[in-house]
Protein backbone atom coordinates (compact mmCIF):
# COMPACT_ATOMS: atom_id res chain seq x y z
CA UNK A 1 0.00 0.00 0.00
CA UNK A 2 1.34 3.45 -0.95
CA UNK A 3 2.62 5.56 1.89
CA UNK A 4 0.74 8.71 2.83
CA UNK A 5 2.36 12.08 2.44
CA UNK A 6 4.31 12.88 5.63
CA UNK A 7 2.86 16.38 5.84
CA UNK A 8 -0.63 14.90 5.54
CA UNK A 9 0.17 12.40 8.30
CA UNK A 10 1.05 15.23 10.70
CA UNK A 11 -1.74 17.47 9.43
CA UNK A 12 0.51 20.42 8.53
CA UNK A 13 1.35 22.38 5.40
CA UNK A 14 4.65 22.05 3.52
CA UNK A 15 5.67 25.48 4.79
CA UNK A 16 5.26 24.51 8.47
CA UNK A 17 8.03 25.68 10.79
CA UNK A 18 10.02 23.38 13.09
CA UNK A 19 7.90 24.46 16.06
CA UNK A 20 4.68 23.80 14.14
CA UNK A 21 5.95 20.34 13.14
CA UNK A 22 6.84 19.52 16.74
CA UNK A 23 3.49 20.76 18.04
CA UNK A 24 1.58 18.74 15.42
CA UNK A 25 3.64 15.64 16.22
CA UNK A 26 3.03 15.94 19.96
CA UNK A 27 -0.72 16.24 19.39
CA UNK A 28 -0.86 13.22 17.06
CA UNK A 29 1.48 11.10 19.21
CA UNK A 30 -0.56 11.75 22.33
CA UNK A 31 -3.80 10.96 20.51
CA UNK A 32 -2.53 7.69 18.98
CA UNK A 33 -0.22 6.37 21.72
CA UNK A 34 -0.88 2.59 22.05
CA UNK A 35 -1.18 2.72 25.84
CA UNK A 36 -4.05 5.17 25.44
CA UNK A 37 -5.75 3.13 22.69
CA UNK A 38 -5.75 -0.43 23.97
CA UNK A 39 -9.10 -1.10 22.27
CA UNK A 40 -7.98 0.29 18.88
CA UNK A 41 -5.82 -2.24 16.97
CA UNK A 42 -4.98 0.34 14.29
CA UNK A 43 -3.55 2.86 16.75
CA UNK A 44 -0.08 1.29 16.92
CA UNK A 45 0.35 1.34 13.12
CA UNK A 46 -0.88 4.94 12.97
CA UNK A 47 1.43 5.86 15.84
CA UNK A 48 4.42 4.39 13.98
CA UNK A 49 3.40 6.29 10.85
CA UNK A 50 3.36 9.57 12.82
CA UNK A 51 6.79 8.79 14.32
CA UNK A 52 8.21 7.99 10.89
CA UNK A 53 6.86 11.22 9.42
CA UNK A 54 8.27 13.35 12.22
CA UNK A 55 11.63 11.54 12.13
CA UNK A 56 12.05 12.69 8.53
CA UNK A 57 10.57 16.19 8.72
CA UNK A 58 12.36 17.17 11.95
CA UNK A 59 15.77 16.67 10.27
CA UNK A 60 16.70 19.47 7.85
CA UNK A 61 18.68 17.21 5.46
CA UNK A 62 16.09 14.45 5.36
CA UNK A 63 13.29 17.00 5.01
CA UNK A 64 15.07 18.58 2.03
CA UNK A 65 15.50 15.16 0.42
CA UNK A 66 11.85 14.29 1.04
CA UNK A 67 10.63 17.63 -0.34
CA UNK A 68 12.61 16.94 -3.54
CA UNK A 69 12.16 13.20 -4.09
CA UNK A 70 9.29 12.17 -1.81
CA UNK A 71 9.34 8.69 -0.27
CA UNK A 72 11.78 7.52 -2.96
CA UNK A 73 14.53 9.41 -1.13
CA UNK A 74 14.53 6.72 1.56
CA UNK A 75 13.94 3.60 -0.52
CA UNK A 76 17.54 3.11 -1.74
CA UNK A 77 19.30 4.12 -4.94
CA UNK A 78 19.15 7.84 -4.20
CA UNK A 79 22.74 8.24 -3.10
CA UNK A 80 24.30 8.54 0.33
CA UNK A 81 23.29 10.61 3.27
CA UNK A 82 19.52 10.47 3.08
CA UNK A 83 19.21 7.36 5.26
CA UNK A 84 22.03 8.14 7.63
CA UNK A 85 20.92 7.91 11.23
CA UNK A 86 17.45 7.03 9.94
CA UNK A 87 14.31 5.41 11.22
CA UNK A 88 15.61 1.84 11.33
CA UNK A 89 17.92 2.31 14.35
CA UNK A 90 15.85 1.84 17.50
CA UNK A 91 18.50 3.12 19.86
CA UNK A 92 19.14 6.30 17.91
CA UNK A 93 15.42 6.78 17.38
CA UNK A 94 14.62 6.65 21.08
CA UNK A 95 17.44 9.07 21.81
CA UNK A 96 16.37 11.50 19.11
CA UNK A 97 12.82 11.63 20.43
CA UNK A 98 13.64 11.67 24.15
CA UNK A 99 12.93 15.38 24.53
CA UNK A 100 9.50 15.03 22.96
CA UNK A 101 8.56 11.88 24.87
CA UNK A 102 9.79 13.39 28.13
CA UNK A 103 7.58 16.44 27.66
CA UNK A 104 4.64 14.57 26.18
CA UNK A 105 4.47 11.47 28.36
CA UNK A 106 6.36 12.53 31.49
CA UNK A 107 3.29 12.33 33.72
CA UNK A 108 1.80 9.43 31.79
CA UNK A 109 4.87 7.15 32.10
CA UNK A 110 6.23 8.51 35.35
CA UNK A 111 9.18 10.34 33.82
CA UNK A 112 12.68 9.13 32.94
CA UNK A 113 15.50 8.85 35.38
CA UNK A 114 15.29 10.96 38.50
CA UNK A 115 15.84 10.13 42.12
CA UNK A 116 14.65 6.91 43.77
CA UNK A 117 11.11 7.04 45.05
CA UNK A 118 10.47 7.57 48.73
CA UNK A 119 8.95 4.54 50.42
CA UNK A 120 6.64 6.70 52.54
CA UNK A 121 3.27 7.53 50.99
CA UNK A 122 0.52 9.77 52.30
CA UNK A 123 -2.69 8.03 53.31
CA UNK A 124 -5.94 8.52 51.42
CA UNK A 125 -8.52 11.10 52.42
CA UNK A 126 -11.80 9.74 53.78
CA UNK A 127 -15.39 10.95 53.53
CA UNK A 128 -18.04 10.56 56.23
CA UNK A 129 -21.69 11.57 55.72
CA UNK A 130 -23.25 12.87 58.95
CA UNK A 131 -26.95 13.63 59.40
CA UNK A 132 -28.07 16.23 61.95
CA UNK A 133 -31.45 17.67 62.88
CA UNK A 134 -32.43 21.26 62.11
CA UNK A 135 -32.39 21.97 65.85
CA UNK A 136 -28.80 20.68 66.08
CA UNK A 137 -27.84 22.77 63.06
CA UNK A 138 -29.37 25.80 64.80
CA UNK A 139 -27.53 25.36 68.11
CA UNK A 140 -24.40 23.50 67.08
CA UNK A 141 -23.63 20.10 68.55
CA UNK A 142 -20.82 17.74 69.53
CA UNK A 143 -21.13 14.37 67.76
CA UNK A 144 -19.23 11.12 68.24
CA UNK A 145 -18.73 9.14 65.04
CA UNK A 146 -17.23 5.72 64.36
CA UNK A 147 -14.96 5.72 61.32
CA UNK A 148 -13.64 2.49 59.77
CA UNK A 149 -10.18 3.27 58.40
CA UNK A 150 -6.63 2.05 57.96
CA UNK A 151 -4.44 3.10 60.89
CA UNK A 152 -0.71 2.72 61.51
CA UNK A 153 0.24 -0.77 62.68
CA UNK A 154 1.33 -0.69 66.32
CA UNK A 155 3.43 -3.85 65.98
CA UNK A 156 5.83 -2.39 63.38
CA UNK A 157 5.24 1.33 64.05
CA UNK A 158 3.98 1.72 60.51
CA UNK A 159 7.18 0.53 58.79
CA UNK A 160 5.72 -2.75 57.52
CA UNK A 161 8.81 -4.66 58.68
CA UNK A 162 9.03 -7.14 61.54
CA UNK A 163 10.28 -5.43 64.67
CA UNK A 164 10.16 -2.01 63.03
CA UNK A 165 13.20 -2.70 60.81
CA UNK A 166 13.89 -0.45 57.83
CA UNK A 167 12.86 -1.44 54.32
CA UNK A 168 15.59 -2.04 51.71
CA UNK A 169 16.01 -0.72 48.18
CA UNK A 170 14.12 -2.75 45.59
CA UNK A 171 16.65 -4.78 43.53
CA UNK A 172 14.43 -4.80 40.43
CA UNK A 173 14.10 -1.04 39.95
CA UNK A 174 17.03 0.12 42.12
CA UNK A 175 14.68 2.26 44.16
CA UNK A 176 13.17 4.08 41.18
CA UNK A 177 9.70 2.55 41.51
CA UNK A 178 9.67 2.18 37.70
CA UNK A 179 11.08 -0.31 35.22
CA UNK A 180 11.77 0.21 31.53
CA UNK A 181 10.43 -1.94 28.73
CA UNK A 182 11.02 -1.72 24.97
CA UNK A 183 7.76 -1.14 23.08
CA UNK A 184 8.04 -0.75 19.36
CA UNK A 185 10.49 2.03 18.64
CA UNK A 186 10.91 3.57 22.05
CA UNK A 187 11.25 2.79 25.75
CA UNK A 188 8.25 2.85 28.07
CA UNK A 189 8.48 3.09 31.86
CA UNK A 190 6.00 1.20 34.01
CA UNK A 191 5.38 0.67 37.71
CA UNK A 192 7.83 -1.84 39.15
CA UNK A 193 6.00 -5.17 39.73
CA UNK A 194 8.29 -6.15 42.61
CA UNK A 195 7.75 -3.15 44.89
CA UNK A 196 4.51 -1.83 43.31
CA UNK A 197 6.13 1.53 42.71
CA UNK A 198 7.31 2.00 46.30
CA UNK A 199 11.02 1.82 45.44
CA UNK A 200 11.69 -0.32 48.51
CA UNK A 201 10.71 -3.75 49.76
CA UNK A 202 10.38 -5.34 53.18
CA UNK A 203 12.50 -8.46 53.61
CA UNK A 204 10.78 -9.61 56.80
CA UNK A 205 7.17 -8.40 56.64
CA UNK A 206 5.34 -7.64 59.87
CA UNK A 207 3.17 -10.61 60.86
CA UNK A 208 0.34 -8.32 61.95
CA UNK A 209 -0.03 -6.06 58.90
CA UNK A 210 1.75 -8.36 56.39
CA UNK A 211 4.11 -5.59 55.32
CA UNK A 212 1.49 -2.93 54.64
CA UNK A 213 2.41 -0.81 57.66
CA UNK A 214 -1.25 -0.32 58.56
CA UNK A 215 -4.27 -2.30 59.70
CA UNK A 216 -8.04 -1.87 59.44
CA UNK A 217 -9.66 -0.56 62.61
CA UNK A 218 -12.75 1.39 63.64
CA UNK A 219 -12.03 4.65 65.46
CA UNK A 220 -14.31 6.84 67.54
CA UNK A 221 -13.91 10.56 66.90
CA UNK A 222 -15.55 13.58 68.49
CA UNK A 223 -16.68 16.14 65.90
CA UNK A 224 -17.70 19.70 66.69
CA UNK A 225 -20.61 20.74 64.45
CA UNK A 226 -20.83 24.56 64.47
CA UNK A 227 -24.16 26.40 64.55
CA UNK A 228 -25.45 27.33 61.11
CA UNK A 229 -24.34 24.29 59.12
CA UNK A 230 -26.53 23.24 56.22
CA UNK A 231 -26.72 20.33 53.82
CA UNK A 232 -23.45 20.22 51.87
CA UNK A 233 -21.32 21.89 54.57
CA UNK A 234 -17.89 20.22 54.67
CA UNK A 235 -15.79 19.93 57.83
CA UNK A 236 -12.12 18.90 57.53
CA UNK A 237 -10.35 16.93 60.25
CA UNK A 238 -6.66 17.08 59.36
CA UNK A 239 -4.71 13.84 59.78
CA UNK A 240 -7.78 11.75 60.64
CA UNK A 241 -7.96 9.92 57.29
CA UNK A 242 -6.24 6.68 56.39
CA UNK A 243 -2.77 6.10 57.76
CA UNK A 244 0.13 6.60 55.36
CA UNK A 245 2.04 3.70 53.87
CA UNK A 246 5.25 2.77 55.69
CA UNK A 247 5.54 5.83 57.87
CA UNK A 248 3.94 8.35 55.51
CA UNK A 249 1.57 11.04 56.85
CA UNK A 250 -2.11 10.27 57.32
CA UNK A 251 -4.75 11.67 55.00
CA UNK A 252 -7.61 13.91 56.10
CA UNK A 253 -11.20 13.11 57.07
CA UNK A 254 -13.96 15.18 55.48
CA UNK A 255 -17.34 15.32 57.22
CA UNK A 256 -20.21 16.13 54.85
CA UNK A 257 -23.32 17.44 56.63
CA UNK A 258 -26.90 16.54 55.73
CA UNK A 259 -29.64 18.41 57.65
CA UNK A 260 -32.86 16.44 58.10
CA UNK A 261 -36.22 17.92 57.19
CA UNK A 262 -38.19 19.51 60.04
CA UNK A 263 -41.86 18.93 60.80
CA UNK A 264 -42.65 22.67 61.08
CA UNK A 265 -39.93 24.65 59.35
CA UNK A 266 -38.52 24.69 55.85
CA UNK A 267 -35.09 26.22 55.33
CA UNK A 268 -33.72 28.50 52.64
CA UNK A 269 -30.13 29.42 53.54
CA UNK A 270 -30.32 31.39 56.79
CA UNK A 271 -34.07 31.99 56.49
CA UNK A 272 -36.86 29.75 57.83
CA UNK A 273 -40.36 29.35 56.46
CA UNK A 274 -43.44 28.29 58.46
CA UNK A 275 -46.99 27.81 57.15
CA UNK A 276 -49.59 28.69 59.82
CA UNK A 277 -53.31 27.79 59.50
CA UNK A 278 -55.85 30.45 60.60
CA UNK A 279 -59.64 30.39 60.75
CA UNK A 280 -61.87 32.25 58.31
CA UNK A 281 -62.99 34.52 61.15
CA UNK A 282 -59.43 35.38 62.18
CA UNK A 283 -58.46 36.08 58.58
CA UNK A 284 -61.52 38.26 57.98
CA UNK A 285 -61.62 40.13 61.29
CA UNK A 286 -57.93 40.18 62.13
CA UNK A 287 -56.40 39.00 65.37
CA UNK A 288 -53.31 37.30 66.70
CA UNK A 289 -51.77 33.87 66.26
CA UNK A 290 -49.02 32.22 68.29
CA UNK A 291 -46.28 30.65 66.18
CA UNK A 292 -43.37 28.45 67.32
CA UNK A 293 -39.76 29.54 66.74
CA UNK A 294 -36.66 27.42 66.13
CA UNK A 295 -35.12 28.42 69.46
CA UNK A 296 -37.87 26.51 71.28
CA UNK A 297 -39.96 29.56 72.14
CA UNK A 298 -42.90 31.22 70.42
CA UNK A 299 -43.98 34.63 69.15
CA UNK A 300 -47.40 36.23 68.82
CA UNK A 301 -48.05 37.62 65.37
CA UNK A 302 -50.79 40.08 64.43
CA UNK A 303 -53.04 39.06 61.57
CA UNK A 304 -54.34 42.04 59.56
CA UNK A 305 -58.09 42.05 58.87
CA UNK A 306 -58.91 40.74 55.41
CA UNK A 307 -55.83 38.50 55.16
CA UNK A 308 -55.81 35.91 52.38
CA UNK A 309 -54.08 32.55 52.05
CA UNK A 310 -50.46 33.13 51.08
CA UNK A 311 -50.02 36.40 52.96
CA UNK A 312 -46.54 36.49 54.49
CA UNK A 313 -45.23 38.17 57.61
CA UNK A 314 -41.63 38.37 58.78
CA UNK A 315 -40.05 37.81 62.17
CA UNK A 316 -36.62 39.37 61.90
CA UNK A 317 -33.69 37.54 63.45
CA UNK A 318 -35.72 34.38 64.13
CA UNK A 319 -34.08 32.32 61.38
CA UNK A 320 -30.85 30.31 61.33
CA UNK A 321 -27.51 31.72 62.49
CA UNK A 322 -24.96 32.49 59.79
CA UNK A 323 -22.24 29.82 59.73
CA UNK A 324 -19.37 32.29 59.86
CA UNK A 325 -21.01 34.92 62.03
CA UNK A 326 -22.92 37.98 60.91
CA UNK A 327 -26.21 37.55 62.75
CA UNK A 328 -29.19 35.38 61.91
CA UNK A 329 -31.74 35.13 59.16
CA UNK A 330 -35.49 35.78 59.38
CA UNK A 331 -38.53 33.60 59.85
CA UNK A 332 -41.25 33.99 57.23
CA UNK A 333 -44.79 33.13 58.27
CA UNK A 334 -47.30 32.30 55.55
CA UNK A 335 -51.00 32.27 56.41
CA UNK A 336 -53.20 29.42 55.22
CA UNK A 337 -56.89 30.32 55.63
CA UNK A 338 -58.58 27.08 56.65
CA UNK A 339 -62.01 26.15 55.33
CA UNK A 340 -64.13 24.62 58.14
CA UNK A 341 -65.30 21.02 57.76
CA UNK A 342 -67.94 18.79 59.44
CA UNK A 343 -70.36 21.72 59.84
CA UNK A 344 -73.52 21.45 61.92
CA UNK A 345 -76.88 22.42 60.49
CA UNK A 346 -76.81 25.70 62.42
CA UNK A 347 -73.34 26.54 61.10
CA UNK A 348 -74.43 25.87 57.54
CA UNK A 349 -77.48 28.09 58.04
CA UNK A 350 -75.34 30.93 59.36
CA UNK A 351 -72.89 30.60 56.48
CA UNK A 352 -75.69 30.77 53.90
CA UNK A 353 -77.03 33.86 55.61
CA UNK A 354 -73.54 35.34 55.70
CA UNK A 355 -73.10 34.65 51.99
CA UNK A 356 -76.27 36.58 51.16
CA UNK A 357 -74.98 39.55 53.12
CA UNK A 358 -71.44 39.55 51.73
CA UNK A 359 -71.86 40.21 48.02
CA UNK A 360 -69.83 43.40 48.29
CA UNK A 361 -67.16 41.91 50.55
CA UNK A 362 -65.36 39.68 48.03
CA UNK A 363 -63.48 42.02 45.67
CA UNK A 364 -61.29 39.34 44.15
CA UNK A 365 -64.29 37.13 43.42
CA UNK A 366 -66.20 39.99 41.79
CA UNK A 367 -63.17 40.91 39.71
CA UNK A 368 -62.66 37.30 38.60
CA UNK A 369 -66.25 36.72 37.52
CA UNK A 370 -66.31 40.09 35.78
CA UNK A 371 -63.33 38.94 33.73
CA UNK A 372 -65.04 35.62 32.99
CA UNK A 373 -68.15 37.43 31.75
CA UNK A 374 -66.02 39.66 29.53
CA UNK A 375 -64.26 36.60 28.15
CA UNK A 376 -67.51 34.84 27.21
CA UNK A 377 -69.00 38.03 25.77
CA UNK A 378 -65.96 38.33 23.55
CA UNK A 379 -66.34 34.72 22.40
CA UNK A 380 -70.01 35.11 21.47
CA UNK A 381 -69.79 38.68 20.14
From Swiss-Prot:
The keyword Zinc-finger applies. SMART domains: DnaJ. Its cofactor is Zn(2+). Keywords: Chaperone, Cytoplasm, DNA replication, Metal-binding, Repeat, Stress response, Zinc, Zinc-finger. Zn(2+) 2 binds at residues 170, 173, 192, 195. Gene3D superfamilies: DnaJ domain, Heat shock protein DnaJ, cysteine-rich domain, Urease metallochaperone UreE, N-terminal domain. It comes from the Bacteria. Zn(2+) 1 binds at residues 153, 156, 206, 209. Participates actively in the response to hyperosmotic and heat shock by preventing the aggregation of stress-denatured proteins and by disaggregating proteins, also in an autonomous, DnaK-independent fashion. Unfolded proteins bind initially to DnaJ; upon interaction with the DnaJ-bound protein, DnaK hydrolyzes its bound ATP, resulting in the formation of a stable complex. GrpE releases ADP from DnaK; ATP binding to DnaK triggers the release of the substrate protein, thus completing the reaction cycle. This is Chaperone protein DnaJ.
Amino acid sequence: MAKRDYYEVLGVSRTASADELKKAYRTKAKELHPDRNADNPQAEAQFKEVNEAYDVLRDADKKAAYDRYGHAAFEGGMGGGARAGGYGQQGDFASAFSDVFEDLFGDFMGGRGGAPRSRAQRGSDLRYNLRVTLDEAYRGVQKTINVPASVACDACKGTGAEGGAEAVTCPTCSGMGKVRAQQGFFTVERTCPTCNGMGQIVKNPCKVCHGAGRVEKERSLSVNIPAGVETGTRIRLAGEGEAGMRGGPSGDLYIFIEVREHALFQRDGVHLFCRVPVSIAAAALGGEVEVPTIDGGSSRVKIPAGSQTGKQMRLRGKGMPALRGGGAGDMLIELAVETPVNLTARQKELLREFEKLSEDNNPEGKSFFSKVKGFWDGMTG
